[in-house]
């Protein structure tokens, strides 16, 4: 049996393995060989892992993404001046203003979308308002001769029904059952 071949020995139980290990490690020459073998194996595995990672990075082209562009060290200097933050920007809390393309008013950026919606007549109520305007500007009568044919209709824009949730126990059980009542 040569020294380069791996040795495979089967043991009957754990105690036999431990006694054989203790006998093997009691010899200083064997202990030194085992320590050197372990150290060389760890170094080889580490180097091989790094070589494979670098090779894979170059083959896939991800080295350029990892290395990136050289950075300008001046852009990372910390500024210590009054009225400026650490990056050199002024500490202004001025709100950003926008100009409405419809009416040319200056509006705060946080209110620009609601303003534009109302200004252009695109809001959620604008279709109702438009239909009211059309109804008011229409000629005096309609086909049936009545001024308003929807006077007797239910008012769907009125109050909404409120839900009242009441916990109720049924049949003496401990489980709560929720019943919903409409007022």
Swiss-Prot record:
One of its GO terms (cellular component) is DUBm complex. A zinc finger (SGF11-type) spans 98-119. GO terms for molecular function: transcription coactivator activity; zinc ion binding. It is found in: Nucleus. It holds the Pfam family Sgf11. Residues 140-167 are annotated as: Disordered. The keyword Zinc applies. It comes from the Eukaryota. Its main location: nucleus. InterPro entries: SAGA_su_Sgf11 (IPR013246), SGF11 (IPR051078). The keyword Chaperone does not apply. Keywords: Activator, Chromatin regulator, Metal-binding, Nucleus, Transcription, Transcription regulation, Zinc, Zinc-finger. GO terms for biological process: chromatin organization; regulation of transcription by RNA polymerase II. Residues 146-156 have a biased composition (Acidic residues). The long N-terminal helix forms part of the 'assembly lobe' of the SAGA deubiquitination module. HAMAP family: Sgf11 (MF_03047). Component of some SAGA transcription coactivator-HAT complexes. Within the SAGA complex, participates in a subcomplex of SAGA called the DUB module (deubiquitination module). Component of the transcription regulatory histone acetylation (HAT) complex SAGA, a multiprotein complex that activates transcription by remodeling chromatin and mediating histone acetylation and deubiquitination. Within the SAGA complex, participates in a subcomplex that specifically deubiquitinates histone H2B. The SAGA complex is recruited to specific gene promoters by activators, where it is required for transcription. Belongs to the SGF11 family. This is SAGA-associated factor 11 homolog.
């Amino acid at each position: 049996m040569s020294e380069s071949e791996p040795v495979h020995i089967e043991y009957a139980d754990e105690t036999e393995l431990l006694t054989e290990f203790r006998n093997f490690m009691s010899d200083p020459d064997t202990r030194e060989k085992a320590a050197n073998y372990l150290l060389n194996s760890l170094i080889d595995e580490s180097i091989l892992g790094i070589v494979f990672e670098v090779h894979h990075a170059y083959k896939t082209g991800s080295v350029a993404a990892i290395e990136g562009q050289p950075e300008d060290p001046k852009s990372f200097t910390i500024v210590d001046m009054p009225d400026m933050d650490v990056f050199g920007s002024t500490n202004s809390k001025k709100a950003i203003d926008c100009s409405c393309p419809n009416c040319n008013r200056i509006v705060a950026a946080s209110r620009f979308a609601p303003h534009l919606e109302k200004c252009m007549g695109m809001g959620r109520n604008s279709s109702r308002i438009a239909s009211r305007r059309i109804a008011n500007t229409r000629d005096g009568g309609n086909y049936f001769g009545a001024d308003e044919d929807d006077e007797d209709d239910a008012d769907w824009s009125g109050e909404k029904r409120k839900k009242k949730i009441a916990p109720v126990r049924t049949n003496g059980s401990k489980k709560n059952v929720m019943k919903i009542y409409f007022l």
